[in-house]
Regions:
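Conserved "landmark" site that anchors the functional core of diverse proteins
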Residues: 1-4, 24-368
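Exposed loop and linker-edge segments at protein-protein interfaces
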Residues: 394, 400, 429-432, 437
Length: 450
C-alpha cells in the first residue's frame, strides 16, 4: 500500500467518484456516490489533513488529532496563508479554527477535485517547512481581578439559575480547587504570569479571543457553567476548559470568571490600537494581563474607545522550532503539573457524583396558580405580563413610590424586565421573593393610591 505521506497529490486517499481531475467545467458530486463524508485523508499524526464537504459550497479541513496543540494551529495558519497567496478564482473566503480551516468556494468556478489537488499540494509544502514562524504581538491588557461586574453576574446566577453550583459563590475558589492550587494568590499569580496566545477570534462574536497560555503549566482548566449564565458583563474575562476568553459583548456565558478588561471591539474604528478594524486583537497575539483596580478599569473603559488610553503593544515573532525546544526542555515539569492537575480535576468530579451535583435538574418548575387575594378599596395590583424568574425586589411594604419607579425586576428569555409603578402611592404588599418563578398574569406588588 502507498504511504499517504509520500503520495503525490493526485493519488491521495479520496472518496470522490472517478472523473477528470482538472476539468474546467463545473463538477457535479452526487451524494449517493460518496462512500464516506471524508473526501480526502492524507498524512499521519500531526501532519494529517482530513477534508469533509460542508454543504454545497464549503470544504472543512481538519488537522491532526482533536487536541490542543499549537503545532496544529500554526500549520493551519500556514495553509491558510498559502491558499490566500494563490488568490484562487472561485475561493470566497477562508475561516480558520483552532485545528481546522473552512474554505468557502464557488464550485462552478473551481471544481472540487481541482481544489482538493491544490489543498493537498500546499499541505505538502507546509509540512515540509523547517522554520515555521509567525508574527506575534505582545498586547498588555489591564485586568480588574474579581471585578464587581463578575461578582454581580455570579449573584444573579445564584438567585435565578442555580444557587448550589460547585463554582458558586466564588469562581476563583472553584478554579483553585479544580487545579489543586494552594491558595487564591496562586490562581492570581498564574493568570498574571501567563502569556495567552490568541488561537482564534470571534468566540463567539465581536472579535472575542479564544486563547491559551504558551507554557502548559499556566493552563488552568475548568468546567463551564451548567446551566449557562443568562448574563455576563461586556469584556468579562473567563476560563473554560483550557481556554481563556474575553467576552466581546454583554450576553449569556459559561466560562469561569477571573476579572474584567477593556473593550475588544470598537465600532467607530477611530482608535490607533485597532489599526482601522473594529476588532482589537490578531491571530497569534500574546495577551499579558497586568492588575488594575475596579475604579481604574472604569476610567480605562471610558477613555479607551475615545483614543485617550494607549495600549502597550510589543512586536515579536513566534518560532515553532524554538517553542518545541522549550517544551522538550521543560517536559518533566509539564508532565508533573498535568498529572497533579488531572488528579484534582477527577477528584472534583467524584465529589459532584457523591453529593449529587453532577446531575443538575432545575427545580424551579412553574409558579403555582394560587387564588389571588382580593384588592381592598383604593388598592391597585401590579401584575407580571410575562413568565420568568424574579431577579430583584426594589421596594418594601410601606415604601412610597412614584409612577414609573421600578418595583421588581424579572428575568425571562435571558432578558431583564422591570415592572414599573403605574401610579403614585404606597407599597402595601410584595407577593414574590427573589429567585421564585413567576407566571404571566401573577400579581406581584400591591399599591395603594395617594
Amino acid at each position: 500500500a502507498e504511504n499517504p505521506s509520500t503520495a503525490t497529490p493526485s493519488s491521495r486517499a479520496s472518496s470522490l467518484p472517478q472523473g477528470p481531475a482538472n476539468s474546467s467545467r463545473s463538477e457535479v458530486v452526487r451524494v449517493e456516490d460518496l462512500r464516506t463524508p471524508v473526501i480526502l485523508d492524507i498524512g499521519q499524526d500531526d501532519k494529517r489533513l482530513v477534508a469533509r464537504l460542508s454543504g454545497d459550497t464549503h470544504l472543512l479541513l481538519e488537522i491532526g488529532a482533536p487536541e490542543l496543540d499549537l503545532v496544529l494551529r500554526l500549520r493551519g495558519h500556514a495553509l491558510m496563508l498559502a491558499l490566500e497567496a494563490k488568490a484562487l478564482a472561485g475561493v470566497i473566503d477562508l475561516t480558520p479554527g483552532i485545528r481546522s480551516l473552512q474554505v468557502h468556494y464557488r464550485p462552478e468556478q473551481l471544481p472540487l477535485r481541482q481544489l482538493l489537488d491544490i489543498v493537498a499540494g500546499e499541505w505538502d509544502a507546509v509540512c515540509a517547512a523547517k522554520d515555521l514562524q509567525v508574527a506575534s504581538r505582545i498586547v498588555h491588557l489591564p485586568l480588574s481581578w474579581d471585578d464587581p461586574a463578575c461578582q454581580l453576574a455570579i449573584e444573579k446566577y445564584m438567585t435565578t439559575v442555580r444557587k448550589d453550583a460547585p463554582w458558586c459563590p466564588s469562581n476563583l475558589e472553584f478554579i483553585r480547587r479544580i487545579n489543586d492550587l494552594p491558595n487564591l494568590d496562586e490562581v492570581q499569580r498564574t493568570v498574571f504570569d501567563a502569556s495567552y496566545l490568541v488561537m482564534g477570534l470571534g468566540d463567539v462574536y465581536l472579535g472575542a479571543p479564544v486563547a491559551t497560555p504558551l507554557d502548559p503549566r499556566h493552563r488552568l482548566v475548568t468546567t463551564k457553567y451548567n446551566p449557562a449564565r443568562t448574563w455576563t458583563a461586556e469584556n468579562s474575562v473567563g476560563i473554560g476548559g483550557a481556554y481563556m476568553c474575553v467576552y466581546g459583548m454583554e450576553g449569556p456565558g459559561g466560562y469561569q470568571f477571573v476579572g474584567r478588561t477593556l473593550q475588544m471591539w470598537n465600532r467607530y474604528r477611530d482608535v490607533a490600537a485597532f489599526q482601522g478594524k473594529p476588532w482589537l486583537l490578531r491571530f497569534f497575539d500574546q495577551i499579558r494581563f497586568y492588575p488594575v483596580s475596579a475604579d481604574e478599569l472604569v476610567r480605562i473603559r471610558r477613555d479607551f474607545p475615545l483614543g485617550r488610553f494607549a495600549l502597550n503593544i510589543e512586536h515579536s515573532t513566534l518560532n515553532l522550532a524554538d517553542y518545541q525546544a522549550f517544551l522538550s526542555r521543560e517536559a518533566e515539569g509539564i508532565t508533573a503539573f498535568r498529572a497533579q492537575q488531572n488528579a484534582a480535576f477527577n477528584a472534583e468530579r467524584e465529589r459532584w457524583i457523591a453529593n449529587g451535583q453532577a446531575d443538575f435538574q432545575s427545580d424551579e418548575g412553574v409558579a403555582p396558580n394560587t387564588e389571588e387575594q382580593p384588592l381592598q378599596p383604593g388598592q391597585q395590583g401590579v401584575d407580571s405580563h410575562i413568565a420568568g424568574n424574579l431577579w430583584q425586589v426594589q421596594v418594601q411594604p410601606g415604601a412610597r413610590v412614584e409612577a414609573g419607579d421600578v418595583l421588581v425586576i424579572l428575568e425571562s428569555m435571558k432578558m431583564e424586565i422591570p415592572l414599573l409603578a403605574p401610579i403614585n402611592g404606597v407599597v402595601q404588599d410584595v407577593r414574590v421573593q427573589p429567585g421564585s418563578a413567576v407566571r404571566a398574569g401573577q400579581r406581584v406588588v400591591v399599591l395603594s393610591a395617594d
